Amino acid sequence: TTRLGEVSRTRAPGVLIEFAYHDNPEDATWIKQHISEIAENVVLSLTEYFDIPFVSPQPPRRGIVTVRWGYLNIREKPSLDARVLAHAYNGNSIIVNGQWENWYVVNFNGVVGYADSRYIHISQ
């Protein structure tokens, strides 16, 4: 493209990173050849900054909540001390997008967070 847009005065957290000059042919070629490494480095840096684990993308899997008490907490981070974002009840369907240690990265009714993997049965 011959036009570059720049977002300023955002109302949400944002990161503006300049890796090279996209209008320089050598830089543009370098970016194209290294885009995966650049993306992975940015993600690792941001997850470290925000103190959340980097979870490699995995195909989404459908799971069922299996608790014998009130509900399963969907948390902001993979920690029992993390803020609770939502409650999933026994038998609720949940989408599992990845795993970090004994925590699943889940999407429950549009809420993305972490849930203890011991209480989710993955459907085959």
Model-derived segments and their meaning:
Residues G91, Y104-F108:
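SH3/SH3-like beta-barrel fold
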